[in-house]
Amino acid sequence: MTAAIIGISLGLLIILIFSIFKHFDKKIIYGLILSGIGFLYVGFAWTDLLAVVINSIQAVLFFLMAYYGIKKNIHFLIAGYFLHGLWDISYHFFQNSNLIPPNYDLFCISIDFIFGFYLLLLVYRYKNMFQA
């Protein structure tokens, strides 16, 4: 439970920081975060070849979702965060799921869903702000 509280708190803190500094492009910031979190799993799994391959594939997929979210449509970013949350949930069904740190899944799910809902809120609140 502590991991989820830390994840929610950190997610809200990041949102607050980038809301204060309005000159940052939100699509780029949240796209960079999405692309980075996919590659964290590759770092966790480097000791197992099959896990590295699986995690590299998911990292590239989330990188592409981030890219298309920045360049084409923010809905790719929103979908990417929710899908990454589902990835966090499903990761325990893979062999060698113990390669990720304890409670990292709860921490990451919390941040993923906070960012996903925040971006969804922004899209529907400021429809013209996120046109490609």
Placement of each model-derived feature along the sequence:
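Hydrophobic cores of alpha-helical transmembrane segments in multi-pass inner/ER membrane proteins
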Residues: 10-13, 61-64, 110-122
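Hydrophobic, membrane-inserted alpha-helices
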Residues: 12-15, 35-42, 57-65
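Membrane-interface helix caps and helix-loop-helix hairpins in membrane proteins
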Residues: 21-26, 44-52, 95-102
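Cytoplasmic-side transmembrane-helix entry/capping segments in multi-pass membrane proteins
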Residues: 27-36, 54-58, 77-83
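N-terminal signal-anchor/start-transfer transmembrane helix
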Residues: 6-23
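Structural signature of hydrophobic alpha-helical transmembrane segments
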Residues: 1-10, 49-57, 106
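Membrane-interface helix-boundary motifs at transmembrane edges
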Residues: 18-30, 70-71, 128-132
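Membrane-helix boundary connector in multi-pass membrane proteins
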Residues: 77-79, 89-104
